[in-house]
């Protein structure tokens, strides 16, 4: 592999293949952006940026470019109006894909399932707090 991507706070393992070699040492060109386990090659993204990971064994050397990206999370829309007894589904995009959690500010007005399905209970407004990748978004639901 000549390049790889890892997200901030996440780890990945990229193995260097040096012909006929069993003992390889790994090094990062900038440990403020990404660290690498010198024996296993497991990299961890520290902050957004690009580094060169070098694998060496004796006189043999291989390098690859590692890009560290900040995780992203967004909602396709931030509000909806529904009738009492009806539902709407909160749709989101996350990179990397991760567990999304939903919490209703007022369960007497609107409830939300673990899959993001919001149900109108009675007239009013509720804010659904949606979290993923350490990022929080708000979805306002108005029940008519």
Locate each region found by the language model.
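Extracytoplasmic soluble-region selector
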Residues: 1-144
């Amino acid at each position: 592999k000549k390049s790889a991507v890892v997200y901030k706070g996440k780890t990945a393992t990229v193995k260097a293949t040096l012909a006929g070699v069993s003992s390889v040492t790994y090094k990062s060109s900038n440990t403020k952006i990404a660290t690498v386990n010198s024996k296993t090659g497991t990299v961890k993204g520290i902050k957004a940026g690009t580094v060169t990971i070098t694998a060496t064994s004796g006189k043999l050397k291989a390098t690859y470019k590692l890009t560290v990206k900040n995780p992203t999370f967004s909602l396709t829309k931030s509000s909806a109006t529904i009738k009492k007894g009806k539902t709407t589904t909160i749709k989101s995009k996350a990179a990397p894909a991760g567990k999304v959690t939903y919490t209703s500010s007022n369960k007497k007005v609107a409830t939300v399932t673990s899959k993001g399905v919001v149900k109108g209970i009675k007239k009013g407004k509720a804010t659904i707090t949606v979290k993923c990748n350490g990022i929080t978004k708000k979805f306002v639901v108005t029940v008519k």
